[in-house]
Amino acid sequence: MEEGRDAQGEIQTSALGSTRFTRRSLIKSAATIASAAILPSGLAGFAFSGPSASAAESNPAKSTPPAKNPRWYGFNLLEYFSTDADWMKYFPYKNDGMFLEDDFRWIRDWGFNWVRLPMDYRAWTAPDLFTINDKQIEPIDRAIRLGEKYGIHVNVCLHRAPGLCILDTMDEKLTGIAVTKEKTDVFTDPHTLDAFVHQWTFFANRYKGIPSQRLSFNLVNEPIVLPNAAELAELQQRGPIKTTDFFDRERLLRHAKDYTRVARAAADAIRERDPERLVITDGYPGGGLPIPDLASTGMLQSCHTYNPIQLTHHQCEWVRGVLTGAEPLPTWPLKDDKGKVLCDRQTLEALFHPWSELSAQGVPIHFGEMGCYKHTPPDVMLAWFDDTLDILGELNSGWALWNFRGPFGVLDTERSGTKFEDWQGHKLDRPLLTLLQKHAKA
């Protein structure tokens, strides 16, 4: 996997320049999935309720992206995931930031070379938003040292940032998960934007000098612009606000420039202090689509893929409001109750085509999240993973699972029907691990 580390160096030294990848070409590519409503990839993905891409006669031309994408493969580690205690019912972490050395060792020993640390800024930040507790940053320091020790790239990510978190779209009455939502909006409040930039200037100063082969910064998880006051008032006139109202395609794309402005502010502040730092932006909205307006910035763009949501989030508590919880047991390819294919490999190829176009223009890409919740049957999960990872291999892209230990991972998933192997006090899903290893070596 040294190839990935070498490729990283190319990203830092190559000038991306201008790109022919435009917003118009993106919309044209996205339109091949007419029935796919844009929803947050990390929360929901794309919901398929209509014909598959093949039924829509979508057959995007394949291209072979340049092999400059970092070939990083690995997992998300959640020790600083959220200060909201309800999440600990679903993910095995204590929110103490104590990233486990065994995780790094096993990830290395199993042939992987990447960890993403999706974190909640409130774990180390005072209510004034500008005071950072140095003691609470030390666990992140340790994780970076463990990455160096085991030859694993560490991606520092704000899963919750000042004024922005995709989890704030959830309805506690439906999910049963209490989320302490942001009180201000990074897109409309200059003070909050300054606080967001302050987080990244702090990290840039603290970790300056650590090469980008070892460390990268992921600005914010699955960016999404929530409805402003006028839009909320309009929604309320139509009736009770639903979770899906947050993910209206037209409104989200209309606000894309709001996110690019915020992303540029943070990236510029980082590079002012550490010009060589690799900066990563998730796709917009919700990690789903490339961002043409950021194509010339030198940032790597990251896709999160949980498509189709009916398969990847079957019976998942925190997508209630997008799914009902009464959906039938999924199959792969995904079919409706009459046997009609709703989503298959060709559908996924069409969904990923905008990312292929972006990569072909010289913009590095990576898939920073994916996976299937524990209630997806193991045979369906493995078939979906095999197709998805094979497509990502054709894109010359690395990828990471959400998560390592827990309901989306390879350890302690509690997935019914899986023949687990005892592994040093944990339950290992050996068939999934073997499949991941196969694709990580491809």
Where are these regions (language model features)?
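N-terminal carbohydrate-binding accessory modules
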Residues: 55-114
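Aromatic-lined substrate-binding rim segments of carbohydrate-active enzymes
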Residues: 102-163, 262, 271, 385-391
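Active-site region of glycoside hydrolase catalytic domains
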Residues: 177-341, 352-373, 394-397
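Aromatic-rich peripheral "rim/lid" segments of glycoside hydrolase catalytic domains that contact
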Residues: 377-442
